[in-house]
Amino acid sequence: MAARWAQFLLFSLLSLPQVYCEYGMVHVLSEKGSSKGKDYCILFNSQWAHLPHDLGKASLLQLQDQTASVLCSPSDVPDGGFNNRIPMVMRGNCTFYEKVRLAQINGARGLLIVSRERLVPPGGNRSQYEEIDIPVALLSYSDMLDIVKSFGRSVKGAMYAPNEPVLDYNMVIIFVMAVGTVAIGGYWAGSRDVKERYMKHKRDDGAEKHEDETVDVTPIMICVFVVMCCSMLVLLYFFYDHLVYVIIGIFCLAASIGLYSCLSPFVRRFPLGKCRIPDNNLPYFHKRPQVRILLLAVFCISVSVVWGVFRNEDQWAWVLQDALGIAFCLYMLKTIRLPTFKGCTLLLLVLFVYDVFFVFITPFLTKTGESIMVEVAAGPSDSATHEKLPMVLKVPRLNSSPLALCDRPFSLLGFGDILVPGLLVAYCHRFDIQVQSSRVYFVACTIAYGIGLLVTFVALALMQMGQPALLYLVPCTLITSFSVALWRKELAMFWTGSGFAKDLPQPPLVIASVNCPQLPKDSNVPASQQETEEMANPTLHVKELHSPTLAAEEPADNDTKTEQSEVSIAQSEEAAGHNKDDLESKSLNLEQKQLE
């Protein structure tokens, strides 16, 4: 139960949009001109001031080493100020705004803040951005030491932000991962739904124990979910440094469960490790699970722990994060079930409004002028932990660029942009199977999701800023699903989910006929009377089948007559039962073949 609530809490954070850090370069060379220049990575915020894209257009200015101070008070300013120079000062003790304001007042043309910790974008509020007109950037402490070692203390530098390709090749990888996860998860959810009904009909309890329970989402649950989204987002906004580790821990737990759920069907097919552990009284282990299942559980937990320990290793940790994220999304898609298109529409539209409000409306409500959503997704600039929320697929940029010197800029896609439309795709596949529509809803909705994602990438290229993907995915998937149902004249059934049955459809009841031999007709008795007697006394036919002489002895053998009648009726019911089972089996086999 605790794990279920943890997953629900994590799901409430999945629609957070992501932002991109702004990387630039500082080109450093000796004032004497005796050595070749060298580029170093910097992290800046273009809201303070823009940097030129071409090195030839950047001003080459003297770098003044002031790393002995933090530039938080006028006493930290040297005599003569920073006239037309770029001071290098240490990070800490005051805000970025206080540092850059002192530098600008004293004639600086830019500011480099040296950080011993991980680089974060230097942030401020809207009024502070309007007041400052010189660029400010963060430089790592190791790069500062390399500058002093390579060029001495008399150096010049030029800050610039080289252009990058509008779209990177990594977008193809993100597209394949996202669409593939939605398609596989939706298909799996529909197939699993049919299998559950099949197992329930057969009353095969042993087989059902291996399956995870599904959760049918109701309108009340959707309302609770939205309230949790809003509450958790506001709590993260005010208590980010404390709650971010809780979210990371929940992600590790949920991702390990998702990975186990995805791999267990394959592990159960292996012929090895079927033996069970000995009898014991330990919790869970008293059920004597198979050795191979225990090994799988240990493996899944180990993968999550490894990611949790090395999550900030940009060279390879993103591969583990993507694998765990895809497994988690597949698990959620096959576990959470929306029973009606009405519920799907409600969920998608509510989250659509949720995104719009927290991205575009909250900047007018906060003191800093920043949206709550962006502030939480990017991590507050004054965060002491500098941790990032992990609910994203991330792929490093693949195009060659001078910015490859930096900490590998990533392209990101939130799990919510996969799960929320994916629940609609899963509903479409289950509806396809129920109405036997050759998966037209499933295919159309999956294609619509892919088109919506492509539109998101185009908007990203045109606006050169991170996009809330649900802004494009929700209209594409909802309109497409609605149009298909309208075209097939199944809108009422699709809207209410009335095509679904709690159990498998029952075949029509067929009563087997009882073959009775005809009595020899008496010419002296009217035909209508003979037919009436035959219908009223079918047992007589059974008796005459055994011996013609029994007809004359009928009054003396009433007990035998009753006995024979019961046998005849029992045989009739048995034949009808066999026919019913045959029809049910044919119906089940038809659904299984349709899935295959």
From Swiss-Prot:
SMART domains in the record: PSN (SM00730)
| Membrane topology classification | Multi-pass membrane protein
Q: Where is this motif: PAL?
A: 468-470
| Any single Gene Ontology cellular-component annotation | Golgi membrane
Q: Where in the cell is it found?
A: Cell membrane; Golgi apparatus membrane; Lysosome membrane; Endosome membrane
Query: In this record, what's one Pfam family?
Result: PA
Biological-process GO terms, alphabetical: membrane protein ectodomain proteolysis; membrane protein intracellular domain proteolysis; membrane protein proteolysis; regulation of immune response
Question: So which residues are the signal peptide here?
Answer: 1-21
Q: Which UniProt keywords apply?
A: Cell membrane, Endosome, Glycoprotein, Golgi apparatus, Hydrolase, Lysosome, Membrane, Protease, Signal, Transmembrane, Transmembrane helix
Indicate the enzyme's highest-level EC class.
Answer: hydrolase
Q: Which residues are glycosylated?
A: 93
Q: Which residues lie on this side of the membrane: Cytoplasmic?
A: 192-219, 264-289, 337-344, 430-441, 488-596
Chain residue ranges for the region called Disordered? 543-596
Could you tell me what this protein does? Intramembrane-cleaving aspartic protease (I-CLiP) that cleaves type II membrane signal peptides in the hydrophobic plane of the membrane.
Q: What is known of its domains?
A: The PAL motif is required for normal active site conformation. The catalytic domains embedded in the membrane are in the opposite orientation to that of the presenilin protein family; therefore, it is predicted to cleave type II-oriented substrate peptides like the prototypic protease SPP.
Protein name in UniProt? Signal peptide peptidase-like 2B
Organism of this sequence: Gallus gallus (Chicken)
- Whichever gene encodes this chain, its name is SPPL2B
